From Swiss-Prot:
It is found in: Cytoplasm. One of its GO terms (biological process) is arginyl-tRNA aminoacylation. PANTHER family: ARGININE--TRNA LIGASE, CYTOPLASMIC (PTHR11956:SF5), ARGINYL-TRNA SYNTHETASE (PTHR11956). It catalyses: tRNA(Arg) + L-arginine + ATP = L-arginyl-tRNA(Arg) + AMP + diphosphate. The gene is argS. HAMAP family: Arg_tRNA_synth (MF_00123). Its main location: cytoplasm. Keywords: Aminoacyl-tRNA synthetase, ATP-binding, Cytoplasm, Ligase, Nucleotide-binding, Protein biosynthesis. A motif ('HIGH' region) lies at residues 138-148. The lineage of its organism: Bacteria, Pseudomonadati, Pseudomonadota, Betaproteobacteria, Burkholderiales. This is Arginine--tRNA ligase.
Length: 593
């Protein structure tokens, strides 16, 4: 049922409940009518939608729930506006109200899809509101790994879903370009520039071992110029002793590499925010000073502590260590102050589950500033790790990174690149990248964020129903093929299909497919409200399944014009919703496979 019809029916039910309640208690009686929520029953035989309002109100109204349900139904069907929406109403069990929606109401989804096209499912209900979604936020110390890939998929799709509700969404990447890890990157590159390699005497213990460090050192010594998308070009100084120059070059080099990873993955950001700018602009010091003045800190053992227990943390936390350096959550607090000051009253951070411990500290710091930031700010979506499998074995290493599998490895392997071919990116064609990107994005969004994910390369390469992205894309391609055949054989023009006689769509499979199409708008609203982008992938698999069931049961290429065009209209609407949903995931919708 379309949201507009559902809202109308819920309003009619609420009016019916009020009528019955006043009849039982008197016109002047005061009572609270609970929100009417219609749900699709788990068993199709129980009707199209159901609600339990009679059981909720039976006790307050002093009556039997089943008898109350009967009176509510009688009041409902007596309303003229309900007669075009409801075919039948039944009472089940102790007082459930089960409603069967009219055929016309079910068929209305097809016209809605044709009318709205790519906008079908979206809403402007949150227009004028702004949301910042921060995700990936990797250290510029190496290529993006598969955990970053999961975060990129979650963040990008969630941003799309939230934008579908009318929000103005700002995508942001926070670069942790300050601290010990950046220092380790510099000494790693310096060691490579000196001709050392992992395992050699003199190789720094904390150095990074990936082959990419050798590439950075080579380009630095060759005087190459590199730049991130939002950064100034940096040219290799060729001076092995100039550690600061090496650091700047290495950071710029890896930021550029990460830009290329994100481009291959189809992810774009509106802004890159540098942690180093928080120090250079004095924001960290300013935040700490404000917390001191607010009485949220105390000194002990030469360190400055934040009273995080005041905000629910299990113990107070050190902000500034005895050596004068800050602990890692302090710049996070300063960074979130900038988000608030930029006008983002709703902020969502996508992070690995290993960041769970920082949530209370960041929120405590923000509350301690007393600048109007609400409790629970920001929101978090935490994801668990990804394990990569191939040939039944876990893949732990890659030539690129040395100690982990990179996003680019995963994209290329999932697109069909042979092991070892990833070492020569110029050998990877665009079709391979597209196939790989589609598989990786769909797979990584196909589970709830808080569950561990096993990425099976062999499954991603399968071209059958076992592969979920293939299953959904094949449904889209199959419909495109049928519509082309209808054009060739019967001169059926898709643009004319909205005029088809939809009363022909009476089979259980057709009705079920129409109901699934009508769920898409509510599905997007739910996914946005619950920060649950995986719900879109779940829905698309279900929709593809409903299509296959319908197509196997109903012949579309028939000579009889009325049923042919009606079924073709249903297929065309299904194709559009599949395309819309795949676009929400950042996955292509091929017309041929």
């Amino acid at each position: 049922m379309l949201p507009a019809h559902k809202q109308t029916l819920e309003a009619l039910l609420a009016d019916s409940v009020a009528q019955v309640a006043h009849a039982l208690k008197g016109a002047d009686a005061e009572f609270v009518i609970p929100a009417i929520t219609l749900e699709r029953p788990k068993v199709a035989a129980h009707g199209d939608v159901a609600c339990n309002v009679a059981m909720q109100l039976a006790k307050p109204l002093g009556t039997n729930p089943r008898q109350l349900a009967e009176r509510i139904v009688a009041a409902l069907v007596a309303q003229p506006a309900a007669q075009g929406l409801v075919d039948a109403a039944e009472i089940a069990g102790p007082g459930f109200i089960n409603l069967r929606v009219s055929a016309a109401a079910k068929q209305a989804v097809i016209a809605a899809v044709f009318e709205q096209g790519r906008a079908f499912g979206t809403s402007q209900r949150e227009k004028g509101k702004r949301v910042l979604v921060e995700f990936v936020s990797a250290n510029p110390t190496g290529p993006l790994h598969v955990g970053h890939g999961r975060q990129a998929a979650l963040g990008d799709v969630l941003a799309n879903v939230i934008a579908s509700q009318g929000y103005a969404v700002h995508r942001e990447f926070y670069y942790n370009d300050a601290g010990v890890q950046i220092a380790n990157l510099a000494i790693s590159t310096q060691a490579r520039a000196r001709g050392l390699k992992p395992g050699d005497a003199g190789w720094p213990e904390a150095a990074y071992n990936g082959e990419y460090i050798a590439d950075i050192a080579r380009d630095y010594l060759n005087g190459a110029t590199v730049a991130a998308k939002d950064g100034e070009p940096v040219t290799g100084a060729r001076d092995i002793e100039n550690l600061d120059a090496i650091r700047k070059f290495a950071v710029a080099y890896l930021r550029h590499e990460q830009d290329m990873d994100l481009q291959a993955f189809g992810v774009k950001f509106d802004q890159y925010y540098l942690e180093s700018s928080l120090y250079s602009e004095g924001r960290v010091e300013k935040t700490v000073d404000a917390l001191v003045k607010a009485g949220m800190t105390y000194e002990q053992d030469g360190a400055l502590w934040l009273r995080t227990t005041d905000e629910g943390d299990d113990k107070d936390r050190v902000m500034r260590k005895s050596d004068g350096t800050y602990t890692y959550f302090v710049p996070d607090v300063a960074y979130h102050v900038t988000k608030w000051e930029r006008g983002f009253t709703k902020v969502i951070n996508i992070q690995g589950s290993d960041h769970h411990g920082t949530i209370a500290r960041v929120r405590a710091g923000l509350q301690g500033l007393h600048i109007g930031i609400p409790k629970g700010y920001p929101d978090y979506v935490l994801h668990k790790m990804v394990t990569v499998m191939r040939d039944g074995q876990e893949v732990k290493l890659s030539k690129r990174a040395g100690s982990y599998v990179t996003v680019r490895d995963l994209i290329e392997w999932s697109g069909g690149a042979a092991p070892g071919q990833e070492a020569a990116p110029d050998m990877i064609d665009e079709a391979t990248i597209t196939r790989g990107r589609d598989a990786v994005r769909f797979f990584l969004i196909s589970r709830k964020a808080d569950t561990e994910f096993v990425f099976d390369i062999d499954l991603a390469l399968k071209q059958n129903d076992e592969n979920p992205v293939y299953y959904v894309q094949y449904a889209h391609a199959r419909i495109c093929s049928v519509l082309n055949e209808l054009k060739a054989r019967y001169n059926v023009d898709v643009a004319q299909l909205p005029g088809a006689d939809l009363s022909q769509l009476t089979s259980p499979q057709a009705v079920s497919l129409m109901q699934k199409l009508a769920e898409y708008p509510d599905l997007l609203t739910h996914a946005a409200n619950e920060l649950a982008p995986h719900a879109v992938a779940f829905y698309l698999r279900d929709l593809a399944g409903e299509f296959h069931s319908f197509y196997n049961a109903e012949r579309v290429l028939v000579d009889d014009e009325a049923p042919r065009n009606a079924r073709a209209a249903l297929l065309a609407a299904t194709r559009q919703v599949l395309e819309n949903g795949l676009a929400m995931l950042g996955v292509s919708a091929p017309a041929k496979m």
